Amino acid sequence: MPLRNLTETHNFSSTNLDTDGTGDDHDGAPLSSSPSFGQQNDNSTNDNAGLTNPFMGSDEESNARDGESLSSSVHYQPQGSDSSLLHDNSRLDLSQNKGVSDYKGYYSRNNSRAVSTANDNSFLQPPHRAIASSPSLNSNLSKNDILSPPEFDRYPLVGSRVTSMTQLNHHGRSPTSSPGNESSASFSSNPFLGEQDFSPFGGYPASSFPLMIDEKEEDDYLHNPDPEEEARLDRRRFIDDFKYMDKRSASGLAGVLLLFLAAIFIFIVLPALTFTGAIDHESNTEEVTYLTQYQYPQLSAIRTSLVDPDTPDTAKTREAMDGSKWELVFSDEFNAEGRTFYDGDDPYWTAPDVHYDATKDLEWYSPDASTTVNGTLQLRMDAFKNHGLYYRSGMLQSWNKVCFTQGALEISANLPNYGRVSGLWPGLWTMGNLGRPGYLASTQGVWPYSYESCDAGITPNQSSPDGISYLPGQKLSICTCDGEDHPNQGVGRGAPEIDVLEGETDTKIGVGIASQSLQIAPFDIWYMPDYDFIEVYNFTTTTMNTYAGGPFQQAVSAVSTLNVTWYEFGEYGGYFQKYAIEYLNDDDNGYIRWFVGDTPTYTIHAKALHPDGNIGWRRISKEPMSIILNLGISNNWAYIDWQYIFFPVVMSIDYVRIYQPSNAISVTCDPSDYPTYDYIQSHLNAFQNANLTTWEDAGYTFPKNILTGKCTSSKFKLSS
């Protein structure tokens, strides 16, 4: 296809015009000067004479024509040339026949032969618009013409809209010398019948694109959708997708839904069912754990004596502090295998099913954690979730079954875990029968009172504003009014506590220690008894406890170091040791002595609890005392070293024995001078419902006393 020659040199002047390409238009205005081309045929010259610039307005073309009709000394400047862009004062003088550097663009590389000719400002020639559609059209081109690259048609089948190349060729070859030639005018007025490699839309043939809004193509509906129709389809798209869904799409959708439902079942439903245990469909056959193979005859299994037949004869007596022999009045050797202690199972012991909230324990006391194995009672603590708590343990108590009033209580035990590890709370202790351990409503106003005066000591907070006491006052005081609720009016009653052992750890020296204490109320000033009446026998192993009490109890306590072999674990562990108390409750010569093994650790004499401040004498307990054996764990007791507590841990009890003077034997919970049975029976709600925390919650009220109740008592008179 012939293009305008940008490389050949052509000099022209106003006198060197082709006669076939000159003349006036129909208005008489002079036409633009057209240079003659020495190496181009006449047909090509004539074809280009009538062309106009499609990208210039009529005013711009008129100005261009006026500029072309100036003096012949001014050379012709084609529209769009580089020279036209220069300012008038600095525009290049094109009248000088100075050469321009050779063209070195794309076409110079593709047609090197055309570049070899001299450059003589031939770029001033008007653009050449001949179009070639086939090689035959270019047969008359000279070797200096630059050929365009092969035509690329993106849409080879665009229909009749594209002008045929034959028609274009006809327009390109029609003569243009006649001003009235309609064919030439039609061709020159159509800006899109120019060379095919030019397009204002990015380099493709202009004839291949629709340029008018009314032109239509077969794929217009894809590019110009109807908004209303699209909106209607959008509203029904979900329904139509299902309505016109083929089998393959339906099967794919079903597969996706199936995978989604399977994922929900596997990752949500199945874990929930597994966690709740809803799918643990075990057989209906009840599993029974046999604690022992021993067969007990129904009648011979009943013990007829408080002293266990398995107790050796050498243990039938015990020597007291004064050298007298006290006789054995009760014993339990726990030699029978598989004993259980649910309520009603055993005549002497009960394993309660409670949470010990009084000390904010972390375990739940469950009856199934207390049983007899290998000739011992075992209280087992597991990291086993129970009743919303994460630990389960055992407690055994003889409340309202076996009690004693003064005497000696001896217990042989192997303590749990390691002695050097802090956290566990093993306990061997006693408490007055008017309070049941773990049942807070029953203990309110009686624990740990041991008081026989009618003064500030029986009032709430001891009538002291300094916060020494948070107790509600003594419920069963000595001066209870006539007609009030009292087990035996005229006697001060309570539920004091004596601890044979509470296990803890001395973390500085890494050994276990035994806290042995008396818990009483009301309290001394600063919780300090008279230490002139307290004996410590060996200060290398026993010292008075730095903890002397708090607003809920006064604790007269001493701590003694223990051997690491007396614990469950350890290189030499597994040995048993006996712990004991010995006490007499005489007001003048009474005492309490504690033992580790056969060695006494310290003694409190009755005179250590003399009047102090606005309170009177605290007495060594005259109440019938029940026995409690338990293994607990609580942050209120000691730092818990979790990583070294190896659950399950077990406190083993070899035996429990009670000794009393032969002239003062009382192994009952309802002695005549300190009765408890009738009182308990008339207030069973407080003693059987562990969820009740106050006496009022159980439905009862504190009895009035003559000190604060404005009433009288026939059993007690205030001294003047």
Swiss-Prot record:
Keywords: Cell wall biogenesis/degradation, Glycoprotein, Golgi apparatus, Membrane, Phosphoprotein, Signal-anchor, Transmembrane, Transmembrane helix. The chain crosses the membrane at residues 253-273. Residues 1-252 are cytoplasmic. GO terms for molecular function: glucosidase activity. It is a single-pass type II membrane protein. Residues 1-17, 31-51, 69-90 have a biased composition (Polar residues). GO terms for biological process: (1->6)-beta-D-glucan biosynthetic process; fungal-type cell wall organization. Residues 289-664 form the GH16 domain. Its main location: Golgi. The keyword Electron transport does not apply. It comes from the Eukaryota. Gene3D superfamilies: 2.60.120.200. Residues 274-720 are lumenal. Involved in the synthesis of (1->6)- and (1->3)-beta-D-glucan polymers of the yeast cell wall in vivo. It is required for full activity of beta-glucan synthase in vitro. May be involved in the maturation and transport of cell wall proteins (CWP) to the cell wall. May act as a transglucosidase and contribute to the construction of a protein-bound glucan-structure that acts as an acceptor site for the addition of (1->6)-beta-D-glucan at the cell surface. Present with 4760 molecules/cell in log phase SD medium. Belongs to the SKN1/KRE6 family. The cytoplasmic domain interacts with the actin patch assembly proteins LAS17 and SLA1. Interacts with KEG1. This is Beta-glucan synthesis-associated protein KRE6. It comes from Saccharomyces cerevisiae (strain ATCC 204508 / S288c) (Baker's yeast).
